[in-house]
């Protein structure tokens, strides 16, 4: 295990909703890959405690989804604060990627970054300012090469680690079928 500025940091957050001014982070996970998308390490998968009054105000979709996948119970049982989860995540990332080297990688990462800026600013600052957003390729493929856009199907568990693994596989799919490096 050694730091490499070419390694990529993949992240996913689960939140109580989409508005960082009203909602909070309830789960965070990270994976580090090399530049060729080979998984080097999985970081801690952390449920972040949030009070019941916040969880009770989630949308019907969030309540249904995060209850069905077990996340609500994990959040209620967790003792972790956002700050503790942030520090554990940074400690993991320091083993693999120098600060400021990797773009934030994943699906719709601009949304995750909004929450990181608000609730985990030191982690937000760990990333390069650029984004590697798989959803950009998904949108382009849907418009420019629709015959491949249905070729990758997600399980949609809405658990952070599962979502990251799917994002990495999805980018590999687009690399093979859409970008075609060879």
Curated annotation (Swiss-Prot):
SMART domains: EXOIII
Record InterPro entries: Exonuclease_RNaseT/DNA_pol3, Oligoribonuclease, RNaseH-like_sf, RNaseH_sf
Active site residues per record: 129
PANTHER family: OLIGORIBONUCLEASE, MITOCHONDRIAL (PTHR11046:SF0)
Domain Exonuclease: 8-171
Family assignment from sequence similarity: Belongs to the oligoribonuclease family.
Protein name: Oligoribonuclease
Pfam families hit by this protein: RNase_T (PF00929)
UniProt feature coiled coil, ranges: none
UniProt-listed Enzyme Commission number(s): 3.1.15.-
Gene: orn
GO cellular component, one term: cytoplasm
UniProt keyword list: Cytoplasm, Exonuclease, Hydrolase, Nuclease
